[in-house]
Amino acid sequence: MARRDQLVSFLCFFLIVSAVAGGLCVSATVLPMRVGKQYVVGGRSGWRTPPPASVDLYAKWAAGIRFYVADSIEFVYKNDSVVKVDKFGYYHCNATAAAANDGSVLFLLDAPGFAYFSSADADHCKKGQRLMINVDSAPSPSPSPSPAPQEAATASAATSSSAATAAHALLLAAMAMMGLILGEW
């Protein structure tokens, strides 16, 4: 009898694990994760002191891009440096953090809001070698053409039907196994 109790306990555990796994499978099909994009600051020119007539070089570069959490920016440079700074450090070219100066550094944009970067060389920063970007929380889903009402209902039913089928298959397999094992006792 003790062995049967152990077996029933194991099967209950198996059913719980199966239900959780089925739920994860369903949520994975419904909630896709976002993979961020990677941008090279300054494009092909990279991170360098802008020419005197282009002190807004990096502001113009960033204006054409919408940054989101999970994106990353790479600074590629020669004989220079880059440091992440706060708002004060950006506007006053005052870098107090350790600077990267190995030719390339990648920063993950992991929080919404403004992010500030500058050359650790205050003179370069004052000449425009600094970057301020606004990072958005998440991209909004792109609008897609609305299907005809019948097509929309069919597509929605097919998506929820396939997710439900996977969860039910796991549950039925667990119940069948339990029935086979208990039938032997």
Curated annotation (Swiss-Prot):
UniProt-annotated location(s): Cell membrane
Top-level lineage group: Eukaryota
Protein name: Early nodulin-like protein 17
Gene name of the encoded protein: ENODL17
Function statement: May act as a carbohydrate transporter. Required for male fertility and seed yield.
PANTHER family tied to this protein: BLUE COPPER PROTEIN, EARLY NODULIN-LIKE PROTEIN 7
Tissue: Expressed ubiquitously. Accumulates mainly in anthers, stigmas and ovaries.
Family per similarity comment: Belongs to the early nodulin-like (ENODL) family.
Native source species: Oryza sativa subsp. japonica (Rice)
Residues bearing carbohydrate: N79, N94
Pfam name, any one: Cu_bind_like
Residue pairs linked by disulfide bridges in the UniProt entry: C93-C125
UniProt keyword terms in alphabetical order: Cell membrane, Disulfide bond, Glycoprotein, GPI-anchor, Lipoprotein, Membrane, Signal
InterPro entries for the chain: Cupredoxin, Phytocyanin-like, Phytocyanin_dom
Lipidation (GPI-anchor amidated serine): S156
Signal peptide span: 1-21
Chain ranges of the Phytocyanin domain: 37-137
GO cellular component: plasma membrane; side of membrane
SUPFAM superfamilies on file: Cupredoxins (SSF49503)
Propeptide: 157-185
Topology term for the membrane: Lipid-anchor; GPI-anchor
